[in-house]
Regions:
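Bacterial Sec-dependent N-terminal signal peptides
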Residues: 1-25
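Non-catalytic cap/lid and distal C-terminal segments of serine-dependent acyl enzymes
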Residues: 21-309
Length: 309
């Protein structure tokens, strides 16, 4: 009887350990170091996955790419929709072909409950009239993105990256810490927050990749005041084209079908502010939708643009 109880207790402990074990995504090359539940003064705790390329060495300096929605970057067996950016595969291929400089990827997981608040640019939102803010809140509530009155938390999210995460990465890994080697990237709302980051912190980020940028903020165009406010914000806050690179793109299917007309207005602002082929790309991809599979197919373009040797 005693041995049976011991056996059951041992089995329970082992089962608990297995359930609590964190399984890292499988990658084709390199390795992932995970910081579990990175604690912050500014945002909810979340995992951070650092991808190191094959042959990573403390004797070599690496550029850094911060990416949002970190749980969607690798290994489709672990993602909610079984799709992935396959960032490791794309970067490894480009490195083997000597098309990009050495880099590491810092994948910041989203918090499903606060993702929209974390990624929604706060300053443009705050310029809206109260009735317009109420409209945005109502649209997001109907879409299930918030249960309460909507308040962006993106300024705090960027403080987390700048004041807490970047110092950790700079101290822990063999990386360049300057603007010319610090980049940020994401898709959809992740595209918005990447653009907001380079505008708010032009001394920190030298480049941003904004794929399928979610210019509409909510999920409908009708009676939506935020796209125009984003355009106004860019008109006054874009960083210098002399020291920064910005990449945009969009498809024209599913959610991406709502972006091209706004993106063309953004393009006009980029030209007016002095951006040219050396500092800016906008790619239009007819037939492509709003998905990780679509972003994977063209990820090489912004990577080559930002990290070109």
């Amino acid at each position: 009887m005693h041995s049976t109880v011991i056996l059951h207790i041992t089995f329970f402990i082992l089962l608990t350990q297995i359930k609590s074990q964190t399984f890292l995504p499988k990658v084709v090359s390199g390795k992932i170091n995970r910081i579990e539940n990175f604690k912050s003064r500014y945002i909810t705790e979340r995992n951070v996955d650092i991808w190191l390329p094959e042959g990573y060495s403390d004797t070599i300096k690496y550029a850094v790419l911060y990416m949002h929605d970190g749980q969607m970057l690798y290994d489709g067996d672990q993602t909610w929709n079984k799709q992935t950016w396959d960032v490791d595969r794309v970067v490894t291929d480009l490195l083997k072909k000597n098309k990009i400089s050495n880099l590491i990827i810092v994948g910041i997981w989203n918090d499903e409950q606060t993702r929209h608040q974390d990624y929604f640019p706060a300053k443009p939102f705050e310029q809206l009239k109260q009735i317009e803010k109420d409209t945005i809140s109502a649209q997001l509530q109907r879409a299930g993105r918030t249960k309460e009155i909507f308040h962006p938390k993106s300024d705090n999210y960027l403080k987390f990256i700048i004041e807490e995460l970047k110092p950790y990465i700079d101290n822990k890994y063999s990386v360049y810490t300057n603007r010319d080697n610090t980049f940020i990237a994401g898709s959809s709302m992740g595209g918005l927050i990447s653009l907001y980051a380079i505008c708010e912190f032009p001394k920190i980020f030298g480049g941003a990749a904004c794929l399928s940028t979610h210019w509409i903020g909510t999920f409908i165009l009708e009676n939506n005041p935020i796209p125009n406010e984003f355009l106004k914000y860019l008109n006054y806050n874009l960083p210098s084209p002399n020291f920064h690179k910005i990449y945009f793109d969009c498809g024209d299917q599913t959610l991406d079908s709502l972006y091209p007309e706004i993106q063309k207005k953004v393009d006009s602002i980029m030209v007016k502010k002095g951006f040219d082929n050396n500092s800016w790309i906008t790619g239009y991809f007819p037939g492509e939708n709003h998905s990780e599979e679509a972003w994977n197919k063209r990820l090489n373009i912004p990577l080559e643009f930002l990290f070109k040797k």
